[in-house]
Regions:
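Glycine-rich, acidic/polar active-site loops that bind/position phosphate-bearing ligands
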Residues: 1-214
Length: 216
């Protein structure tokens, strides 16, 4: 074989939307080469390696994402469209928010899988929604984002809808993004904070911002 998939047992979860008889579980895997070494281009391996190196220096990175997506209709043949009949906007609720039941179902299924959800709401554009996770260790949250996307698509389909995470599926309305809040801790202290600075930002925080700007 070219590669091996090695299951990460910490990611085991029962899929709550599947029949309870003959239950179906989800496991995420790490990619390994035939010689038993991790595949160095695997995004999951790169993230785990980076987190390990940070931990050696005493740092723990915590993140919480704001995951945005659209829920559109499908046509008579089940083909996805960018059509919606709702006119809801930011923080609207039912009956204006026609996707509220689907979003609620998504959140309940995520929680049944052990994924902690902090909040959910309708976003700015019609048919646009947001689900926010509770903060957690960076690799755990990355894994949860992958499970989140699978869950959203699955539950949306059960409601007769099509979910898309495209940044800009419709030109005339707001697009979707994924804001990610970062914090870096050492010895239980948020190292990005410096109360003595006018902006209350530490030297590490400025280095972090500079590094992110350089990557862009």
């Amino acid at each position: 074989p070219d590669m091996y998939l090695r299951p990460d047992l910490d990611t085991f979860a029962i899929l709550p939307w599947r029949p309870q008889q003959g239950k179906v579980a989800r496991l995420l895997c790490d990619i390994y080469c035939p010689d038993g070494t991790p595949h160095e281009r695997s995004p999951r391996y790169i993230l785990k390696k980076t987190a390990r190196e940070a931990k050696k220096e005493g740092y723990t990175c915590l993140v919480d994402p704001e995951c945005e997506f659209f829920l559109f209709h499908t046509d008579d043949n089940g083909v996805p469209t960018t059509v919606t009949h709702e006119k809801a906007g930011y923080l609207d609720v039912s009956p204006v928010d026609l996707g509220e039941n689907a979003r609620r179902d998504i959140v309940l299924n995520l929680e049944d899988m052990g994924i902690e959800v902090e909040s959910s709401h309708h976003e700015t554009a019609p048919a646009q929604h947001e689900v926010d996770f509770k903060y957690g260790e960076v690799r755990t949250i990355a894994d949860r984002i992958m499970s989140f996307k699978m869950t959203v698509r699955t539950i949306a389909k059960r409601h007769g809808l099509h979910a898309t995470f495209m940044p800009k599926p419709r030109a005339e309305v707001n697009g979707s993004g994924m804001h990610i809040h970062f914090s870096l801790f050492k010895d239980g202290r948020n190292v990005f904070v410096n109360p003595g600075n006018p902006q209350e930002l530490s030297e590490e925080a400025y280095y972090f911002v500079g590094g992110r700007s350089e990557e862009r």
